[in-house]
Regions:
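N-terminal small/glycine-rich loop or linker at the start of catalytic domains
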Residues: 1-19, 70-77, 116-130
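Catalytic alpha/beta core domains of metabolic enzymes, predominantly
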Residues: 105-249
Length: 249
C-alpha cells in the first residue's frame, strides 16, 4: 500500500486542499483539526517563489502530509518562470514534503523530479490535465501507461467533463486499473459528482477548496468532508477515531 508520509493511501478515500502563500498557519491548522487529510503546496501561486521563502511556508503544514506542486500555465497553473528554476525548487522541497507533483508533459525535468522524490523517500505524482475535454478511454489508458513508465507512484488525470459520456470514460480508467495508483478528477460543473464517485472506484485523493478554487468544480472543504463522511461509513469511522486522538500541534 502506498504511503504519503505516514498516511496510507488506497484503503480509504482522502481529501487534499491546495494552499498558496496567502494561507495562514491558523487557517491550515484549523482545517487539520476539522479533518483535512493532505495539504497541497501550490508554489506556482506564490507571489514570491524564492526557495527560502517557499521552504519557510512549510511550518504551516505541521501534522499534515504535504504535496509540493509547481504547476505550469499550460496545465492550469501559474508558473511562468523557467524550468531550471522550477527544478531547483523541486530539489529544495523534496526532502521536506511527502510527494512531488510534476506534469507528464514536463519534458526534460520530469525524470529529475521523479528521481528527486524517490531519493527523498517520497512519492512521485505524474499528472495530466486537459481543460479542453475528456479523451477516449484508450487515450486515457495510454496516459496512465506513460505515467507509470515515467516512474510515477501515482498518476493523476484531471479532465474537463461536459456530459455523462465523459464521466464514463474517466470511470473506465478507474475500473481498468482497479483505481490502483490513480487520482482521477472530472473538472467543471458536470464533473462535480466525480469528485465523490471516483473515491468509491479507488481514486486515491479528491481535491477540495479552502476558499480559493484551483480547478473548475472544486467543492469547499467542509462541504466535501460532510459528503465523504455521509457516503463512506468507513471513512467516517476512521475520521472520528483520528479526530479523537489528534495531536494539537
Amino acid at each position: 500500500m502506498l504511503k504519503l508520509g505516514s498516511l496510507e493511501l488506497g484503503a480509504l478515500p482522502r481529501i487534499a486542499v491546495p494552499f498558496s502563500d496567502r494561507a495562514g498557519r491558523g487557517e491550515v491548522q484549523a482545517l487539520r483539526r476539522r479533518g483535512l487529510d493532505v495539504a497541497e503546496l501550490r508554489v506556482d501561486r506564490f507571489a514570491d517563489p524564492a526557495p527560502a521563502r517557499v521552504l519557510a511556508q512549510l511550518d504551516k503544514f505541521t501534522g499534515l502530509p504535504t504535496i509540493a506542486t509547481i504547476r505550469i500555465r499550460a496545465e492550469g497553473g501559474g508558473w511562468i518562470r523557467g524550468e531550471a528554476e522550477r527544478l531547483a525548487l523541486f530539489h529544495a522541497l523534496a526532502p521536506r514534503v511527502a510527494a512531488l507533483d510534476v506534469e507528464l508533459a514536463a519534458g526534460e525535468i520530469r525524470a529529475e523530479v521523479v528521481a528527486a522524490a524517490h531519493q527523498a523517500s517520497g512519492l512521485a505524482i505524474v499528472s495530466h490535465h486537459d481543460f479542453g475535454g475528456t479523451p477516449e478511454p484508450g487515450e486515457l489508458a495510454d496516459v496512465v501507461g506513460r505515467g507509470l513508465e515515467a516512474g510515477a507512484d501515482v498518476v493523476k488525470i484531471a479532465t474537463a467533463v461536459r456530459d455523462p459520456a465523459d464521466v464514463r470514460a474517466l470511470a473506465s480508467a478507474a475500473l481498468a486499473h482497479g483505481g490502483a495508483n490513480l487520482i482521477l478528477i472530472g473538472m467543471g460543473e458536470a464533473g462535480v459528482a466525480t469528485r465523490l464517485l471516483f473515491a468509491a472506484l479507488g481514486s486515491l485523493l479528491t481535491y477540495a477548496s479552502a476558499g480559493e478554487a484551483t480547478a473548475p468544480g472544486q467543492l469547499l472543504f467542509d462541504e466535501m468532508l460532510a459528503l465523504m463522511r455521509r457516503l463512506f461509513p468507513a471513512y467516517d469511522a476512521a475520521k472520528a477515531a483520528d479526530l479523537d486522538h489528534l495531536d494539537p500541534v
